[in-house]
């Protein structure tokens, strides 16, 4: 097996695989330079693979002769991709006797694309899940072999739902390998008529719009929390809302209705419970207000 992945989300799957199977090599995105002091940061999967003593490859572009040759000559039967962050070149997909499987965080054909976890929360879905699918040249359109649904509760945010899904993915990939070893693999085509697309999160989506129903606003805050987050401006400073809930109070859109940060929106209001100033730690409202002044009657933009 060859494994391809990059973020925290991919770690449970790699751990599960390496505990039961031989992982020949791990591919991940190349280390990034952090602006402060130009420190080089390896991806979470890079660090995990080193702990597991699995060789790591991190080409800037997967599409090159060396990587093609390496994968072709590795004699791997399977390449498992979990949030790698690069498109698999078609010539790789055409290597004989090698199957590329992708672990996608939605119940395909719903939420194909880059941000399925965020979009499912933002659209107030009640459930999402994991799909294990065959990779084909057109993104997220390949036939799937397994799916498992995961319920989304009202308190779930991007972080908590990602954690749930990553653990389900790890178990499901082991089940998929059992089927693969027994040669009982059956792929089902996706129904194109049901396909929806989870577009990449745009920076603009992080700006708050108080002219939004409270329920929809909470869904957006949860979907983008903790990163990139939804922020408002107060006295020129950007403040990120990490957690909030619906309040039945009424007020003008963007107006601070009470001293414990209940803010008016299109229909009702939201009460902010956790927030964060740029570059600072996340604080509960009470602690935040002890060091930063926002008072009843202020307008937040």
Regions found by a protein language model. Give the residues of each.
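Donor/substrate-binding cores of folate-linked one-carbon enzymes
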Residues: 18-19, 29, 78-197, 204
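Short beta->alpha connector loops
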Residues: 6-9, 60-63, 84-86, 224, ...
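An anion-binding loop in the catalytic cleft
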Residues: 211-301
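N-terminal Rossmann-like dinucleotide-binding module
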Residues: 1-37
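N-terminal glycine-/serine-/threonine-rich beta1-alpha1-beta2 phosphate-ribose binding loop
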Residues: 33-77
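Internal alpha/beta domain cores that form substrate/cofactor-binding pockets in large enzymes
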Residues: 24-25, 55-74, 87-105
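Acyl-group handling in specialized metabolite and lipid biosynthesis
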Residues: 199-212
